Amino acid sequence: MHFFFVPNSSSSSPSPANTSSFSLSFLTPQIPENLCKSPTKIHIGTHGISGQSFLSHPTFSSKNTYLYAVVDRSSSGVFSPQKESANGEGEESNTEEGVLVVRRPLLENSDKESSEEEGKKYPARIDAGLSNIAKKMPIFEPERSESSSSSSAAAAARAQERPLAVNLDLSLYKAKVLARNFRYKDAEKILEKCIAYWPEDGRPYVALGKILSKQSKLAEARILYEKGCQSTQGENSYIWQCWAVLENRLGNVRRARELFDAATVADKKHVAAWHGWANLEIKQGNISKARNLLAKGLKFCGRNEYIYQTLALLEAKAGRYEQARYLFKQATICNSRSCASWLAWAQLEIQQERYPAARKLFEKAVQASPKNRFAWHVWGVFEAGVGNVERGRKLLKIGHALNPRDPVLLQSLGLLEYKHSSANLARALLRRASELDPRHQPVWIAWGWMEWKEGNTTTARELYQRALSIDANTESASRCLQAWGVLEQRAGNLSAARRLFRSSLNINSQSYVTWMTWAQLEEDQGDTERAEEIRNLYFQQRTEVVDDASWVTGFLDIIDPALDTVKRLLNFGQNNDNNRLTTTLRNMNRTKDSQSNQQPESSAGREDIETGSGFNLDVFLRSKLSLDPLKLDVNLDSKRLERFTRGRINGA
């Protein structure tokens, strides 16, 4: 259908308002079946157009459905049939200038429309209609597609303005401080907000998972780690590694292996995954597999003190002490401030009864990390074990002064005071340790053992039960059951003692002490056959660990590029450095033997002579730690301890 603007006859005479009217003609294209005989005219008033225009009837074809509007803008005529015939070649250009081609489809108006609607332009009406339709269309809102309440809450949190990235670091530090003060609920709230704002960052998942694990909320921690792996698309090796450690703690060894493998796939340079996986295999007795994993860790991650330290411990267990010392030396070269390496090396020397060398290594450990609680604890227990009770007490007090919230130091100090001082002071120290960390099982076990030795069997049973209520599947629980079994054995409850021994072995079947204690019980009852059967069961079920030195051949290519040099270092009798080390240790032993026959001097002077290092503990405390060696007993006063405990509980 076509329409044209055609002026009426009355428009030929100009008017003062310079107005005229046009008629809108609708023409139907020529169709063989139905030809249009007369046009339909609709009168439209126009303004500002003078002159006469008339209808031009172009030739139509059945395919031509375009809509034309011809308007004569001036008296001279922009487009007319005469000009069209005269200017045949310029027809196209004139048409483009004078003819307005309307390509927007229009709807036919019915006869019932009012004259006011007829005066409006059709394009404006269509635009207005489309605008109304667009207003009625719903805007895409992501939260409508989320059904669960947790998803809607997460979407609402993401919809808010996202804080700067520096706020994540500050929040993580604040949560760490709160967790250190045992304010786990506040720390959890902060970390949950971090996860809501930064779901792609793995650090909040790791921190929150560790807090949940400390509270024995292992199922929640597992769900959190799984969610973290999904949010990070499996690319965060730290979450995989923490999840693997959790599964290993729960006893799911196969699942833990799969997760450690996933951690190494996510990042083959993640040394903690290789090291944790190796420790798992060591506990399972797969020494060759553990060595292979540690070798891969060195290959992909480079020199690392923790891997060297674990390899050294394996060598020490196998009886290859010179290789163990060499690997410990490599660990301290990698990181001279690694307190763990110095302590492990010192324990090796203690096993070999080379006490001066061990003291020198303990000095290195506290100098590398002056506030490390493990260094002061191990050193203090060592000194007390070799007979230096006063020095051991002093070292434990120093560790407590530097770490007043650590329960292990107070536990060891309490046992030391019970053995060499009074039970009341020991009881106060153990009670304080249990208040610092109520979920620390060894504290309750030690306290129960002390009460049993004092004859308070009922109190001892309650304390043992309290320890088992924390977690009944750990190695500490196994030791607790063994100690409780001894209590029942001495009390005459033999059936209860047998049940407790059996429960302890169900947790840790490799406990030599538990097997032999049970066998001794049966032997004391006159059942020698049963006692021998129990001993045979231990030797039959124990894990046989076969370890040889064949792994060194393939391992040398990784630990040092200079293969020949390392071979010489590990070759007994041909290494000058090892010979010098052996000579030095022998000289230390001779010094120790010669000093044992002399009169004892002051503790500080005796230490300087034994170690030969000139290390003065009192000077070190004053200069490096700002502690007065004469005022270490202040924090251990019973009244001060009670006030501190009450303030700590009220603050929490």
Curated annotation (Swiss-Prot):
<dbReference type="Pfam" id="PF13432">
    <property type="entry name" value="TPR_16"/>
</dbReference>
<keyword id="KW-0934">Plastid</keyword>
<dbReference type="InterPro" id="IPR003107">
    <property type="entry name" value="HAT"/>
</dbReference>
<dbReference type="InterPro" id="IPR019734">
    <property type="entry name" value="TPR_rpt"/>
</dbReference>
<dbReference type="GO" id="GO:0006417">
    <property type="term" value="P:regulation of translation"/>
</dbReference>
<feature type="compositionally biased region" description="Basic and acidic residues">
    <location>
        <begin position="105"/>
        <end position="121"/>
    </location>
</feature>
<feature type="repeat" description="TPR 9">
    <location>
        <begin position="441"/>
        <end position="474"/>
    </location>
</feature>
<feature type="region of interest" description="Disordered">
    <location>
        <begin position="1"/>
        <end position="21"/>
    </location>
</feature>
<keyword id="KW-0472">Membrane</keyword>
<comment type="subunit">
    <text>May form homomultimers. Part of a multi-subunit complex in the range of 60-190 and 600-800 kDa in chloroplast membranes.</text>
</comment>
<keyword id="KW-0802">TPR repeat</keyword>
<dbReference type="GO" id="GO:0006397">
    <property type="term" value="P:mRNA processing"/>
</dbReference>
<feature type="repeat" description="TPR 8">
    <location>
        <begin position="407"/>
        <end position="440"/>
    </location>
</feature>
<dbReference type="GO" id="GO:0003727">
    <property type="term" value="F:single-stranded RNA binding"/>
</dbReference>
<dbReference type="GO" id="GO:0003729">
    <property type="term" value="F:mRNA binding"/>
</dbReference>
<dbReference type="GO" id="GO:0009657">
    <property type="term" value="P:plastid organization"/>
</dbReference>
<dbReference type="InterPro" id="IPR044624">
    <property type="entry name" value="Mbb1-like"/>
</dbReference>
<feature type="repeat" description="TPR 7">
    <location>
        <begin position="374"/>
        <end position="406"/>
    </location>
</feature>
<dbReference type="GO" id="GO:0009570">
    <property type="term" value="C:chloroplast stroma"/>
</dbReference>
<dbReference type="InterPro" id="IPR011990">
    <property type="entry name" value="TPR-like_helical_dom_sf"/>
</dbReference>
<feature type="repeat" description="TPR 2">
    <location>
        <begin position="202"/>
        <end position="235"/>
    </location>
</feature>
<feature type="repeat" description="TPR 11">
    <location>
        <begin position="543"/>
        <end position="576"/>
    </location>
</feature>
<feature type="repeat" description="TPR 12">
    <location>
        <begin position="598"/>
        <end position="631"/>
    </location>
</feature>
<dbReference type="GO" id="GO:0010114">
    <property type="term" value="P:response to red light"/>
</dbReference>
<feature type="region of interest" description="Disordered">
    <location>
        <begin position="585"/>
        <end position="610"/>
    </location>
</feature>
<feature type="repeat" description="TPR 3">
    <location>
        <begin position="237"/>
        <end position="270"/>
    </location>
</feature>
<feature type="repeat" description="TPR 1">
    <location>
        <begin position="168"/>
        <end position="201"/>
    </location>
</feature>
<dbReference type="GO" id="GO:0031969">
    <property type="term" value="C:chloroplast membrane"/>
</dbReference>
<keyword id="KW-0694">RNA-binding</keyword>
<dbReference type="GO" id="GO:0009507">
    <property type="term" value="C:chloroplast"/>
</dbReference>
<keyword id="KW-0809">Transit peptide</keyword>
<dbReference type="GO" id="GO:0009941">
    <property type="term" value="C:chloroplast envelope"/>
</dbReference>
<feature type="transit peptide" description="Chloroplast">
    <location>
        <begin position="1"/>
        <end position="68"/>
    </location>
</feature>
<keyword id="KW-0150">Chloroplast</keyword>
<keyword id="KW-0677">Repeat</keyword>
<dbReference type="GO" id="GO:0000325">
    <property type="term" value="C:plant-type vacuole"/>
</dbReference>
<feature type="repeat" description="TPR 6">
    <location>
        <begin position="339"/>
        <end position="372"/>
    </location>
</feature>
<feature type="repeat" description="TPR 4">
    <location>
        <begin position="271"/>
        <end position="304"/>
    </location>
</feature>
<protein>
    <recommendedName>
        <fullName>Protein high chlorophyll fluorescent 107</fullName>
    </recommendedName>
</protein>
<feature type="repeat" description="TPR 5">
    <location>
        <begin position="305"/>
        <end position="338"/>
    </location>
</feature>
<keyword id="KW-0507">mRNA processing</keyword>
<comment type="function">
    <text>Involved, directly or indirectly, in the processing of chloroplast encoded mRNAs. Exhibits sequence-specific RNA binding and RNA remodeling activities, probably leading to the activation of translation of the target gene cluster psbB-psbT-psbH-petB-petD. Blocks 5'-3' and 3'-5' exoribonucleases (e.g. polynucleotide phosphorylase (PNPase), RNase R) in vitro. Necessary for intercistronic RNA processing of the psbH 5' untranslated region or the stabilization of 5' processed psbH RNAs. Also required for the synthesis of psbB.</text>
</comment>
